[in-house]
Amino acid sequence: MAVFTGIVLEMGAVESVSTTGDSGSGRRFEFAAPTLARKLNVGDSVAVNGCCLTAVEVGGSPAAELGTGLRSGLATGRWSADAVDETLSRTNLGGLEVGDAVNLELPLGIGDVLGGHLVQGHVDGVGRVLDPAPDLRVSLPASLARYVVEKGSVTVDGVSLTVVVVGDDSFAVAVITHTMGATTLGRRVAGELVNLEVDVIAKYVERLLSAGATTPYLPTTPDAPTTPDAPTPPSAAARATGSSPR
């Protein structure tokens, strides 16, 4: 499973959008991202606006034409990923058009610095920008409200941010100047949709409590194999008389 940190590597651009699937309900996006493409192989995971996608082409070459480890994206700076209807309907990727900017991040590697917080790339919902950055305020779906707390972490379009204020149906974050320039958050205007991912730890804690976390954890083991009863060894007295118990 890929794990991200919400620290954007590069702000890329949508180069092309085409339909995929028998019904044409899916999309293939081609992105221009010179920095990221140099590090990318076909099959790698990439967070696009906080949504985990798989690279199916790198440098304009499909997976079938690429050898393992070949990074042809170095030459063109382009790569492609597919998104199914489920992803398009649950995120803001369904509204992407040619020329749109996107936030891109590669998964956390062994030894990398955890600069933000643990992000799965599984978008929990979308919010609408109410006030633009730097004092970014976003609408909060009722189903996610209980996971967003003051001074807690939240991911907005793939960017790890600290919650400043939580309201009944919205939350606010402070976006620093660097983040405004290095990500799409500096370009978002009121009314636009952003992807939201809440803290996964909060979701696991809720699940444990609802399932009855007072029951202690006990590791399970396979049932012991059933074997025939071993014969009872003769007693010392029986061995002395040369007889055995019946």
Annotate each predicted stretch with a short phrase:
Residues 1-246:
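Conserved loop->alpha-helix
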